[in-house]
Amino acid sequence: MKKQKTTSQKRKTGAYCRNKGHRYETKIAQELRNLGFTDVVTSRSESKSMDDKKVDLVDRSGKLPCYIQLKNTVNTPQYHAIKKECPLKDKPFIVIWNKQVKKEKVFGSAGEVVIMDKNFFFFFLSK
């Protein structure tokens, strides 16, 4: 007879991962609003079309200087593949990645990084 997996060994369901991703989108949207981008919302709440274009955060006022895709994953996001799927080319495209690592029974953040084109990075340095 096979042993059943204990709760700590169970693989997280798709719904769990999806909800964790949604919470991360909401968190980053709030952080951007706190920085003065008061019209930033998640694309899930604003525009299915933008969500389909790989844009997770929408700035209804247009002040945000880039398109943002958020990733809350263990593996490194494939920046170039994700960017290629976004048909919007009028603003730079960035990925904010919240690296997940196993911490005892659950996954937690190892830190957050931004992945962007070098020219957009240099643009910020020149300000």
Model regions and ranges:
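Domain-level recognition of nuclease-like catalytic cores that cleave nucleotide substrates
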Residues: I94-K127
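Catalytic centers of nucleases
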Residues: R11-L88
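Glycine- and charge-rich intrinsically disordered segments
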Residues: M1-S8, R33
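Short glycine-/polar-rich loops that comprise or flank the Walker A/P-loop
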Residues: D90-P92
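Short linear sequence motifs
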Residues: Q9, C17, V114-D117
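Intrinsic disorder/low-complexity segments enriched in polar/small residues
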Residues: K3-T6, T13, T26, N119
